[in-house]
Amino acid sequence: NPEKNHIKNEIKEICAKYSLERLPRNSEILSSATEEQFSKLQKILLKKPVKSASGVTVIAIMPKPFACPHGRCTFCPGGVEVNTPNSYTGKEPVTLSAIENDYEPEIQIKRKIEQLIAFGHDPTKLELVIVGGTFLFMPDDYQRNFIKSCYDAINGFKSNSLEDAKTNNEKAKMRNVGFTIETKPDYCQQKHVDMMLDYGTTRVEIGVQSL
């Protein structure tokens, strides 16, 4: 990309001129750019453009670990005992982020939105993906509070109820246009489907190991 190479060469020349110790990160350049400069530099300095190439940016979040009601599967490396969600080792980037933020959905989402903006992505259309094992076996109150916190994080303010949070998101600056939940066949029955529809779920993921 000639334009990208030209910009990078200019950055190097400026750094050499002012004897800077290191090249600034793309995110640092974008965060200090004016609105006009940002629009010109965004596509050139954008990291991982595939993340938002479709116009929808995916954010993966994790609930806190809960012990599976059926016991521990032989292939599961995680769990309450090691403070990692079921099916995860604790070394994955999404898991490390969740642990760092105490599994609080609102903090996880806000931090990831900040990162997306810093790297030049447009987070106005989001798809949330709840990973970390079977979400639907967790206590109902925890599920509803978790989902509401997701909408609150995107809306930028707290709503009085889950229904209010979903309604407010329809006109929010950042909108959740897709919502994915991981589950298993035994937690994908009629009552579970009704719950997911109530949460605003648009897609369900079922791991091949459970089939």
What role is predicted for each listed range?
Residues 1-108, 112-158:
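Flexible, acidic/Gly-rich N-terminal and inter-domain linker regions that tether
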Residues 114-211:
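Conserved SAM/AdoMet-binding glycine-rich loop
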